[in-house]
Amino acid sequence: MDIRNIIKRPIVTEKAVLMKEKSNKYTFVVDKSANKFQIKYAVETLFNVKVKSVHTSNCVGKSLKVGRYAAGYRSDWKKAIVKLGKGQEIQLADKV
């Protein structure tokens, strides 16, 4: 798997920003088939940082109402919380 396809996008929520400021942890949406070793290698290669640990979570898609009677579902996705070493930082577009 190509490392550019492992990390899809960062998650920028209030909780994710607090984790970044307090614990130096960054949250990403990643490919569902990626494991922790692949995620660690992708983050270290793409952002030139040293990763201390990776925690992953499979998130189940919620049910939606599509039309008047039909039900649909959002896609399942995978979340990765990456902790960096001291002095490491990833420049995201959070200063816009």
Swiss-Prot record:
Signal peptide: none annotated. Part of the 50S ribosomal subunit. Contacts protein L29, and trigger factor when it is bound to the ribosome. Belongs to the universal ribosomal protein uL23 family. It comes from the Bacteria. PANTHER family: 60S RIBOSOMAL PROTEIN L23A. The keyword rRNA-binding applies. InterPro entries: Nucleotide-bd_a/b_plait_sf, Ribosomal_uL23-like, Ribosomal_uL23/eL15/eS24_sf. Pfam families: Ribosomal_L23. Keywords: Ribonucleoprotein, Ribosomal protein, RNA-binding, rRNA-binding. This is Large ribosomal subunit protein uL23. NCBIfam families: PRK05738.1-3, PRK05738.2-4. It comes from Endomicrobium trichonymphae.
